[in-house]
Amino acid sequence: MNKSRVRKTVVPAFCFCLLTAVAADETGAALFIEAGETSGLDFVHFNGMSGELYLPEIMGAGVAVFDFDRDGDLDIYLLQGHMIGPGKTLGEAILPPKKGAVLTDRLYRNDTAPGKSRLRFTDVTKKSGITAGGYGMGVTTGDINNDGWTDLYISNFGHNQLWLNNGDGTFKDITDKAGVDDPRWSVSAAFVDIDLDGWLDLYVGNYVAYDMGNPKPCRSATTARDYCGPQAFAPLTDRLFLNRGDGSFEDISEKSGITGVFGGALGVVAADFDGDHWPDIYVANDGMANQLWINQKDGTFEDTAPLAGVSVNRYGMPEASMGVAAADFDGDGDEDLFMTHLVRETNTLYVNDGTGWFDDKTAETGLGVASLPYSSFGTAWLDIDNDGWLDLLSVNGAVTLFESHEPTDRVFPLDRRNQLFANDHGKAFIEISDLAGDAFKLSAVSRGAAIGDIDNDGDIDILISNNSGPARLLVNQVGTRNAWLGISILDAAGKSHITGSKVALIRVTGQPLWRRVHTDGSYGSASDPRILFGLGGNRGPQTVEVSWPGGERERWSGLASNRYHALRRGSGIRVGE
């Protein structure tokens, strides 16, 4: 059957359904509304640019949504920049910060009143004790000491920091004690239990060796001076730290094998890609081949990316990989990969066959042409309307002045609009950005993206960071029209989310829906670890099966829909014994 004819019949029908849903909203709102300004989220990113075209100034920054105070709702962490360059002062800033702005990372506590729809955030950075004044790039969340309180790892252009959550609203800098500093340029990282001992280890992706004291001048195709690309600098090796369980980490980078192959990392995601119940690590590199580190179960990893089909695109070319997201978008039970790339390169979708071998299905699924005009960074799989199918977010912003579509006198013309794609039953994606609301019509220099149920109403919201611009909080307006099921997958004590667990929603007809417990992926960002299943019109009791790291399984039945459930390890019915 002719594929083009199939597309012509499927796409309009799908789009018609979405248009009907949007039009039916009595408030006139589209898929998302912007709630940052009205909620007290007053953060504006400052990149410190002074006209020297330093590469770091266009690369930040990520964001995080996480429940730091364990009150049941998601708080927000935003990374900040500062003046950059030897001897540079605020008086030289081309885009100066707001008068009185404190140029450090910011922590916002979610103070939304129970049962209220209006979100409220309070800046509690000073109270928290967090003094993260580095040039922020990325943030990673996880409970490193299994006390039930989420900790923070901050990746910087410069020294990184590990902030331990004290459980009383404050944090302590334990970077030196823990032994996880890296003075180079880090962007994305991931907490992952590589040896299945119950303690989260840490993978840190490092970018390039950039010397602020002797920056290289670069020029565009028009010979005008422009931002350099990564090829002008030497790539850096990544780091892997093994959690000893006593608050310290061992650097096992060399003996694990990950320093043997490397290439300017910007994105990191951990998942079981080959189906052996052990976590693997995928690294997205900028302009160089990517790595798929398969866990050998003895503390070492093997890069299988070239053989697995995920080191380069279908034409054998490495791409400028920025962000990465892993999830089961097609409902076959394995982890697929989506990569964001540079303008005039397509973003790339790698489809897993279940054994860790992948096919580039970018063109077949409709994700290629739509991405060509954009340089894309943060990305996430999210079920916008709770129909059970994972849709796709891509946030965009240029990286060179040459990318400007028209001549302009603006000093920072890198802004682009963001994109949203609807999943057509795992077969194709249709861009629905125009239906998503005014927030997707705005242009910005977007970098980080994190997702989570910010208002706890049962659908996925979006937080986007913008370089030299305000953070954008996009609240979902359509997801709760369908039924949903929220799950927290916890240890036996009911304290910590067990990263790497897989959860299957068992359905009477059709294959199970699989989701992974994680916070990593995107670009320098961290998302909600809770699982949210879209149930469509099925509002009855639900059954889920949890596959714990290592392969043990438990099942829970009779879970009421349209609410969150906390499932403790050991409290379900054992499966497969």
Model-derived regions: residue spans:
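Beta-propeller blade repeat segments, especially FG-GAP/WD-type strand-to-loop junctions
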Residues: 24-34, 84-124, 159-174, 216-219, ...
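Beta-propeller blade termini
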Residues: 60-70, 109-110, 135-150, 162-164, ...
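Gly/Ser/Thr/Pro-enriched helix-cap/hinge segments flanking short amphipathic alpha-helices
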Residues: 24-31, 49, 53, 367-372, ...
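Asp-box/WD-like beta-propeller blade repeats and closely related beta-sheet repeat scaffolds
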Residues: 124-141, 149, 155-194, 204-231, ...
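Hydrophobic beta-strand segments that make up the repeating blades of beta-propeller
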Residues: 76-80, 147-156, 202-206, 276, ...
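Repeat-based blade/solenoid architectures
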Residues: 41-62, 101-103, 128-140, 179-190, ...
